[in-house]
Amino acid sequence: MAPAKKREKDSNPDGSAANGIIGLTHGAPDASNAGSTVPPTAEGQVKLNGHQQEQELFLQAFEKPTQIYRYLRNRHETNPIFLNRTLSYMKERMSRNNKKRISFQVNSMLESITQKSEAVSQNYLHVIYDSLHEKLPARLDNESGEDLLQEQLLCEAGESVSVETTLYKITRSKRKDSTLDFQELLSKCSQIVYNPKDRVGEHATISIPLQTMRPMGEQHTLYKLLFRIKVLSPSTCNDENAETPPNKRSRPNEKMFGSELILYEKSSGFITEGEYEAMLQPLNSTSIKSFSPKKCTWETMPDSYIPLSLTYDVYQQSPMLKFHLTLSNEQLPEMISAPELQRYVQHLDAVAEMNYNNNNYNNNNNCSGLKNGSGGGNSTVCKTTPEHIQIVYNFMYSNNTRQQTEYTQELNCPWCGLDCLRLYALLKHLKLCHARFNFTYQPAGSGARIDVTINDAYDGSYAGSPYDLAGPSGSSFARTCGPVRRTSVTSLMVCRPRRQKTCLDEFLELDEDEISNQRSYITGHNRLYHHTETCLPVHPKELDIDSEGESDPLWLRQKTIQMIDEFSDVNEGEKELMKLWNLHVMRHGFVGDCQLPIACEMFLDAKGTEIVRKNLYRNFILHMCSLFDYGLIAAETVYKTVQKLQGLLSKYAAGQELMQRQREEQLKYWLDVGMHKKQEDPKTLKSPQKPAPPADQASTSSASTSGSGSGSSSMQPPKRMPAHLKRGSAASSPGVQSKGTENGTNGSNSSSSNSKNVAKKSADQPLSTLANTRERRSEYGQKRNVSGSRLAATPASKRKLSSKDNTVLNKRQRYSDGSPGTGIGNGHGGGSGSGANRNKSNNHSLPATSNNASSSSSNSKRAIARRRSTSERTKASGSTGGGAGGVRTRLSVPAKYERR
């Protein structure tokens, strides 16, 4: 057994004075223990301690659920989760019926609104006084009792009393506001009868224009009606001059009573028409100042003030002022007769049916609506009378009764104080709303006994949405946060069986099936998810974002962009491309090299247009080449990606113009500033005063000094230039060509040095002086003498070729020279030999210098010789037929070696 909780106990040994449960009375103590004066024995002391421990365990078991339900009661009163009148077993609490739904028509909506507007659009608010009533206390037999009775009454019955009615306007002031907080709008005095013996013949009226109670826009304005009654002591009440203000000596005999009524408030609107009773309370001379919040003090409250919460029959102990409130278009006279009052009262009954403002009751008014008042309206009071049954609660623990309440006829719930009006509704409420206990109904004669035990099978876990508990404290069940997203329910199974008739037999025994077969009717993921990285709960508004895909939150993207901007060793274009690429990889979470091809494709789909627009075309191509160099993507991927980017560029006209403009700017930069800037001759820079020698002198001097300087020239290779420039320079130097033809039999050293010097000097000549080398390729392939006959090219003029080109040239030379079976060299030996030499010189020899002294006749002779050799070769090939070796075919050779 668990140890008993230490409590402060009284001298009563059975613990009957311990704290009770829910404020109910304890059972009677044991009479034998209470009446025994002899000290108990050891066995009796042990039994007594065991009983106290069981009592402590009983109190501990019932204490926690009771505190929980007490807290839920307070919360449900201020912020209810549901309305009890909507429950099927609480039909008696539903004061409204749905009979009007049968005869409801859409066309009637306009009529009802019109009637409502007509009823509200009145011009005057009338206060019709009835009388002033005060309950007479029980009379005493002696004379002192008569005197005490006269002192307690305001005045003698049937006397007239003056009532001062004042209308005040209270405005919530702000800083630097010129309007008054407290303003008096209207004040009138009327005569009413105090405790009339017979029926009142005339009634005093006050008409208040509604124009004086206009709301001031959004400013909080309150209109309050104050009733004050001044009466004198009985010694001066019958005086003829009672209405005049008393002198200073009689002022202590003056009494003042007052009450207030709120006519208009911004939150509730105008007060409802009806019959009212205002409870009057004693006031002193400074009570009127209590209306101002700045002047409100505790001293203004009278000593005889009785709060409403302390006295139940406070309306019976204070004077009551009866009056009517009506609305009409006409102003009433100051006094009306009783028959006219009945006519206005009937008007109130007719207007009450069209009144829809049912919630204008204000607890600040010390008034109680009796007929068509604030508690009335079109609501219908339930006609069912509450049951009168003697009910007792029996609290049991360990199958033993530990505490029992007194018999009561109230059908209120002991934990939440709800008036259930019927025994069946009470038992149903206890079973469904207080599931921490088990309730068993036992008939007991004309009453009922309800056994209360602890529900050990109660699941204390939260059965609602787990997201309510994950939110901030205080906002889980808040109703002021507005509409928020909630978790979606996969499927909702609704079972609405046929309702059976209510019977108390269902509470006789516990339902074992309901305890064992408890299951949720809501299916789906009724659980709480958490973020992977932060382990924080995922709120319903974050369910669309996958927790695993949170690799690029906003703060991380901003931090990445900031870090890239801080780089100093890359240009702006590379920075922009790095931002786009890094954010793209972070967003999609590419983790492997095999995903890079699809990453490049997705990158172009998402950022292709932006790449062209930001002029990042070359940066992206360089990035693709870098990926290829590191082996991350294949060449096919590079080709497809660039081709796709070209396709995007072809459809983007603005991008094409931008690329063209940027290309022109880049070329201009290269030619003006970059590596392709035109540089001057270094020799000219060394000796700017010495003029450059002519081309023929330079070539002559270089040819004469080539023999002596061959060793130095071999150590310093000449400046290499394209072949077409070398051939063009050779054609544009006539002096050098003539000297080369006359000295054709010189050594190889002199000829090679001569050609090098000519190539060097010809590079500086303008392109306009260069001849077309295609026409001279075959003509100047061999050197010619003065007579115009062709000479074999010198070995020094041959160009070094690769092995592949040499193989092709050898095959062609073999076919052109007349290999075995061709028959070309038999009949035309000289022609074939010269043709072979010509083919060799035309294909793999450098162009020799042409003789500038040859005339036009020599040119025509060379053309005739070419045609003659061509015709002879054609005849020879045609005469040799039949043999396989005699068939001559033309092999495909590279274009640069092909004969022009």
UniProtKB/Swiss-Prot annotation:
**Known InterPro entries for this protein?**
Polycomb_protein_VEFS-Box
Q: Fetch the PROSITE patterns from UniProt.
A: ZINC_FINGER_C2H2_1
Biased composition (Basic and acidic residues) is annotated at: 1-12, 773-782
Q: Where is the composition biased (Low complexity)?
A: 698-714, 738-757, 850-862
Compositional bias (Gly residues) at which positions?
Answer: 820-834
Residue ranges of the region described as Disordered:
1-44, 678-900
Q: Which residues carry this modification: Phosphoserine?
A: 547
Q: Where would I find the C2H2-type zinc fingers in this protein?
A: 411-434
Coiled-coil stretches noted in the UniProt entry, renumbered to this chain:
none
The keyword Metal-binding belongs to this UniProt entry's keyword annotation: yes
Instruction: Indicate where this protein resides in the cell.
Output: Nucleus; Chromosome
Q: Which GO terms describe its biological process?
A: facultative heterochromatin formation; negative regulation of DNA-templated transcription; negative regulation of response to gamma radiation; neurogenesis
- Annotated region (VEFS-box), positions in chain: 527-603
What is said about its interaction partners and assembly?
Answer: Component of the polycomb repressive complex 2 (PRC2, also known as the Esc/E(Z) complex), composed of Caf1-55, esc, E(z), Su(z)12, and possibly pho. PRC2 associates with the accessory components Jarid2 and jing to form the PRC2 Jarid2-jing variant (PRC2.2). PRC2 may also associate with Pcl and HDAC1/Rpd3 during early embryogenesis. This complex is distinct from the PRC1 complex, which contains many other PcG proteins like Pc, Ph, Psc, Su(z)2. The two complexes however cooperate and interact together during the first 3 hours of development to establish PcG silencing.
Annotated function:
Polycomb group (PcG) protein. While PcG proteins are generally required to maintain the transcriptionally repressive state of homeotic genes throughout development, this protein is specifically required during the first 6 hours of embryogenesis to establish the repressed state. Component of the Esc/E(z) complex, which methylates 'Lys-9' (H3K9me) and 'Lys-27' (H3K27me) of histone H3, leading to transcriptional repression of the affected target gene.
Q: Which PANTHER family does the record associate with it?
A: POLYCOMB GROUP PROTEIN, POLYCOMB PROTEIN SUZ12
The similarity annotation says: Belongs to the VEFS (VRN2-EMF2-FIS2-SU(Z)12) family.
Please report the name of this protein according to its UniProt entry: Polycomb protein Su(z)12
Native organism: Drosophila melanogaster (Fruit fly)
User: The organism's lineage?
Assistant: Eukaryota, Metazoa, Ecdysozoa, Arthropoda, Hexapoda
